[in-house]
């Protein structure tokens, strides 16, 4: 069982849902990212996605695009991000770590080489938003050979046959995009969210995590009333661009994580029929 599967099993045993946090690795520095990941874990975050910065991040909104540019300017690259993962594991970090990036950065060193190095460093899964399920055979095989979970995507526009195919191939969890477009904070979650998650759950037992647009505890509660986890990125990344002293940045991220994680625990009193954020 992968570390990701083990985490979801632990959450089920607690009657709890998951919180997955995204950080752009190297923003504002790799050393700060290391401290931020530990702060997230201490706050109860269940998994962390580390964005491997790419110069043309098509799926990312302005907040994460800016973070990627800051990380690139600070010198973040595949080698030192994987070194960061290895350092986090050497520190004793136990929660799952995933790399989110674009396929060009996987192809550049060779698919098998990238997957082998990622797994050796301590990465548990890969998220590649520009690799559709129909074109994922090579990377899926290479990832599976070294124990990496390749995360599959579904969206509100996904037809039933694509949902079924993603469900068949899914490992770790299925990333359900809450709305079309790019990442970023949104004031309101779409009314079709429940139907999309239920459509996925009708064809698989693989956990479903919802991302894009989630930034507040009430949105986490709304999402996890129907899904197995909420993914939060821009709300964390935004703090990294504020030029704060490191200790203040780490503390702000820790507090936000604690507030968001509280929304995944039982007894929140939210009805799964209501997925719109109240104004």
UniProtKB/Swiss-Prot annotation:
UniProt entry keywords in alphabetical sequence: Amino-acid biosynthesis, Aromatic amino acid biosynthesis, Lyase, Tryptophan biosynthesis
Top-level taxon of origin: Bacteria
Catalytic site: 49, 60
Annotated catalysed reactions: (1S,2R)-1-C-(indol-3-yl)glycerol 3-phosphate + L-serine = D-glyceraldehyde 3-phosphate + L-tryptophan + H2O
PROSITE patterns for the chain: TRP_SYNTHASE_ALPHA
SUPFAM superfamilies: Ribulose-phoshate binding barrel
Enzyme Commission number: 4.2.1.20
Cellular component GO terms, alphabetical: cytosol
MF terms in GO: tryptophan synthase activity
Entry annotated with the keyword GTP-binding: no
Pathway assigned in UniProt: Amino-acid biosynthesis; L-tryptophan biosynthesis; L-tryptophan from chorismate: step 5/5
NCBIfam families membership: trpA
PANTHER family: TRYPTOPHAN SYNTHASE ALPHA CHAIN, CHLOROPLASTIC, TRYPTOPHAN SYNTHASE, ALPHA CHAIN
Protein family per UniProt: Belongs to the TrpA family.
Subunit structure, as described in the record: Tetramer of two alpha and two beta chains.
Function description: The alpha subunit is responsible for the aldol cleavage of indoleglycerol phosphate to indole and glyceraldehyde 3-phosphate.
Name of the molecule in the record: Tryptophan synthase alpha chain
Organism: Symbiobacterium thermophilum (strain DSM 24528 / JCM 14929 / IAM 14863 / T)
Gene this protein is translated from: trpA
